[in-house]
């Protein structure tokens, strides 16, 4: 039996903002019915697990207005610079947020953060061969941001204690724990990113 083609019959833009857009699609379901699906379009993002020679990783403590509190997270950033390859975005964010540069980059894990309503996808990189390069002047929430170094095993325990709740950080921490314990291997830097978002970046480029 052939798979059903979920055809989009029509699409309406409800909102276009600085970092996301909201659209309403009419989609044909199996059996012929038409249903409404609302989709948040997103730039997509990258995050970095930067591991030093002793198996420690830096995490940032950043205020998130959505929750009204600070969360422990990985260095990360949006893919909001047109034409910038994702791994170079990751390298820039690593330098800007924690003042580090890495000589080796690999793909650790990709995650679709909210597939029920958003096309946001995040690629988490493993960065090694670290050296300090200094952090540039920060602005907005990042000016308040602090950093801490954690052994990978301790970071994994903090996930399971509920002290790290950011989903991207959880995925990255548990993935690097799997790598360092021999359970899995990271992937090459040029690994295809199947779900990398493109709709919102294209929409912004047209403005």
UniProtKB/Swiss-Prot annotation:
Changing residue 64 to A: 3-fold decrease in KM for ADPR. 910-fold decrease in kcat with ADPR as substrate. Its cofactor is Mg(2+); Mn(2+). Residues 41-172 form the Nudix hydrolase domain. Mg(2+) 2 binds at residue 93. It comes from the Bacteria. A motif (Nudix box) lies at residues 77-99. Changing residue 142 to Q: 2.7-fold decrease in KM for ADPR. 300-fold decrease in kcat with ADPR as substrate. GO terms for cellular component: cytosol. It catalyses: ADP-D-ribose + H2O = D-ribose 5-phosphate + AMP + 2 H(+); 8-oxo-dGDP + H2O = 8-oxo-dGMP + phosphate + H(+); 8-oxo-GDP + H2O = 8-oxo-GMP + phosphate + H(+). It holds the Pfam family NUDIX. Signal peptide: none annotated. The keyword Flavoprotein does not apply. Mg(2+) 3 binds at residues 93, 97, 142. GO terms for biological process: DNA repair; DNA replication; nucleoside phosphate metabolic process; ribose phosphate metabolic process. Optimum pH is 8.0. Mg(2+) 1 binds at residues 76, 97. The active site is at residue 142. One of its GO terms (molecular function) is 8-oxo-dGDP phosphatase activity. Catalyzes the hydrolysis of ADP-ribose (ADPR) to AMP and ribose-5-phosphate. Can also hydrolyze ADP-mannose and ADP-glucose, with lower efficiency. Has weaker activity with NAD, GDP-sugars and UDP-sugars. Also catalyzes the conversion of 8-oxo-dGDP to 8-oxo-dGMP, and 8-oxo-GDP to 8-oxo-GMP. Functions in concert with MutT1 to detoxify 8-oxo-dGTP to 8-oxo-dGMP and may play an important role in supporting cellular growth under oxidative stress. The catalytic efficiency is much higher for the hydrolysis of ADPR than 8-oxo-dGTP, suggesting a more relevant biological role in hydrolysis of ADPR. Homodimer. This is ADP-ribose pyrophosphatase.
